[in-house]
């Protein structure tokens, strides 16, 4: 996956490394071929289809058809030779489901493996962070601290992955009645996550959440990208988390500006990866 990027501007994001297609259980409007066409039209040079591999109750037993998915990736590689099309998977809570996650990784070759936390352990139950009815019963500060603590467990868990996805994910679903979310309120917890990622040589993702309101959508917040560099983080991955072709690379202009402001620049070795000096 080595593609030279010399000549690109410092704020230009050339790859979308977090996209879902029809092979993700929560992407009914996903379409891999159409997402490739959209990427080419936008000047994107590489796209990674990081399909969900979730084992929580929210996935309702949905399982990634690895063989079918990889066949579609191969078809798109042939159809779009101008675009680097990468296979990938987004492992949900792999530290809780190590046998399932590890087993999936043996069933095919994945160019990119993301690690994600979409829920947290809350007492004797699991709190799904995207479910408003469950969030309404939760304490926001306790939820965030539980989330950051479990992220450390995920990073240090038995299943290895390359990129930590959408840090600060719960703020996407922040309820109107809660006090505004501020990263600074959780700086110690966030820095512990970043230190764990540095220790395991995991890259941090800047996720634009399909180009939504930056206050809620940018995961993590710009200040956290700066902390990542301060902590010793050297690699930054950028992804839209698109679940349909229309939002491929959405929000990338702002993402590029944030990466550059924090001291990251597009890698001259691996397209899509941003590195610090």
PLM features: residue spans?
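Extended substrate/RNA-proximal surfaces in nucleic-acid metabolism proteins
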Residues: 59-199
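An N-terminally biased module of ancient metal coordination in phosphate/nucleic-acid-related enzymes
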Residues: 1-95, 111, 172-184, 208, ...
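Hydrophobic residues within beta-strands of alpha/beta enzymes
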Residues: 47-49, 113, 164, 204, ...
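Conserved, mostly hydrophobic/aromatic
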Residues: 18, 39, 113, 166, ...
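Active-site-adjacent C-terminal substructures of enzyme catalytic domains
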Residues: 184-249, 258-259, 264-266
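Non-catalytic positions within long, well-ordered alpha-helices that form the structural scaffold/packing
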Residues: 40, 106, 155-157, 229, ...
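Extended, intrinsically disordered, low-complexity segments
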Residues: 263-277
């Amino acid at each position: 996956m080595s593609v030279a990027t010399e000549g690109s501007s410092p704020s230009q994001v050339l790859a979308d490394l977090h996209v879902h297609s029809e092979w993700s259980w929560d992407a009914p409007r996903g379409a891999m071929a159409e997402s490739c066409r959209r990427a080419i039209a936008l000047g994107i040079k590489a796209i990674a289809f990081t399909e969900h591999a979730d084992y929580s109750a929210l996935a309702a037993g949905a399982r990634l058809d690895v063989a079918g998915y990889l066949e579609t990736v191969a078809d798109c590689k042939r159809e779009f030779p101008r675009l680097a099309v990468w296979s990938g998977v987004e492992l949900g809570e792999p530290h809780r489901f190590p046998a399932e996650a590890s087993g999936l990784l043996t069933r095919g070759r994945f160019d990119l493996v993301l690690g994600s936390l979409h829920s947290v352990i809350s007492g004797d139950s699991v709190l799904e962070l995207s479910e408003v009815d469950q969030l309404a019963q939760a304490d926001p500060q306790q939820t965030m601290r539980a989330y950051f603590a479990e992220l450390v467990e995920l990073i240090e868990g038995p299943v290895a992955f390359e990129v930590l996805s959408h840090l600060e994910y719960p703020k996407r679903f922040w309820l109107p009645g809660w006090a505004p979310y501020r990263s600074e309120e959780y700086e110690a917890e966030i820095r512990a996550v970043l230190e764990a990622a540095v220790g395991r040589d995991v890259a941090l993702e800047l996720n634009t959440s399909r180009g939504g309101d930056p206050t809620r959508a940018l995961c993590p917040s710009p200040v956290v990208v700066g902390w990542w560099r301060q902590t010793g983080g050297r690699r930054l991955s950028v992804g839209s988390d698109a679940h349909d072709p229309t939002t491929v690379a959405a929000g990338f202009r702002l993402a590029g500006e944030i990466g550059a402001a924090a001291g990251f620049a597009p890698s001259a070795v691996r397209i899509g990866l941003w590195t610090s000096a």
